[in-house]
Amino acid sequence: MENFVFTSESVSEGHPDKIADQISDAVLDEILKHDPNGRVACETFVTTGLVLVGGEITTNTYVDIEQVVRNKIHEIGYNNPSYGFDGSCCAVISSIVKQSPDIAMGIDNANEEEIGAGDQEMVFGYACNETKSLMPAPIYYAHLLMKRQAYLRKQNILSWLRPDAKSQVTLRYENNKPIVIDSVVLSTQHHPEIQQKDLIEAVIEEIIKPTLPTHLLHKDTKYLINPTGRFVIGGPVADCGLTGRKIIVDSYGGMAKHGGGCFSGKDPTKIDRSAAYMARYIAKNIVGSGLADRCEIQISYAIGVASPVSVYAETFGTSKLSNEQTTKLITEHFDMRPGKIIKNLKLHTQCYQKTASYGHFGREDENFTWEQLDKVDIFKSI
């Protein structure tokens, strides 16, 4: 048993990197809506007054990429020229090419069971019993803070809030269990006229306290609100944004390993996305069944080959079974070939934009099929 502190961060939908992720997934969604078999690897770069969309896309449908980009930027909240970045007047440049035929030959024109992996890849999935969503507590609560900030901004409850924001939550663990929140860092972009003391009070009383469990807050919990003292200039005016630069925010907040591949902008034949969802699905059902308190799954693939190269389950000594026995159960009951993952998790009919902010895992929306606990009986019978 260990005693330690652990920190995870989240960022808002108005953070530059998250703008890029959401645009990439908005393009993906628009293509899959009309062409479920479209091949998409869409990357986005945002900076002051400019959005550049590039990548490899093969589809039989037409997508007005410029309009998709502008609509998404407005939806996020950059709809005022005074913010320095505005969906109505920023430049939008598109540089799209077709998917390489060398890659396509491994995944196209194959029956569902024989669709090969689009690249060599290793992915990880994780679950633990720290929260009701079976996610690590630090990232779970960091995401909730960002959701609350966006809600108060969009509902005009705190009219001085602006889209860019970040949160960071540190929890103290005893015997591997979270017992108290040690500190909360929250930085939010704001109107230039709001006073710092009013901002700090509002963030603590309207964002932090209604969001975080009272039993985890205590008199010594530290609140660090806009520590630099001013955060007026934000979004792409302050920092460039790129698709795939928040992969730890997107996954488990650093509590679990990461294979390195990002998720957003990729159709489900890209196994760094679809197989990572599958790995989470397996890990969550293992923990949800009560078989283990913590579980991390690794799956690896070779390009053009359907079946995984390797599968490994690590339960950190919290399972009734050995890691070898758990891995054997997984390979017996879960089909991890790309085509079967796509079919079983309904990955051709998703709204991927929903995943592009506030994390890909631990969500309650029915759209997140990899969060279902419909395989727990496999492990409960052990």
Curated annotation (Swiss-Prot):
E.C. no = 2.5.1.6
One annotated GO molecular function: magnesium ion binding
Q: Which Pfam families match?
A: S-AdoMet_synt_C, S-AdoMet_synt_M, S-AdoMet_synt_N
Catalysed conversion reaction: L-methionine + ATP + H2O = S-adenosyl-L-methionine + phosphate + diphosphate
Keyword Metal-binding on entry:
yes
Q: How does it assemble?
A: Homotetramer; dimer of dimers.
Q: Which PANTHER family match?
A: S-ADENOSYLMETHIONINE SYNTHETASE
Task: Provide the protein name.
Answer: S-adenosylmethionine synthase
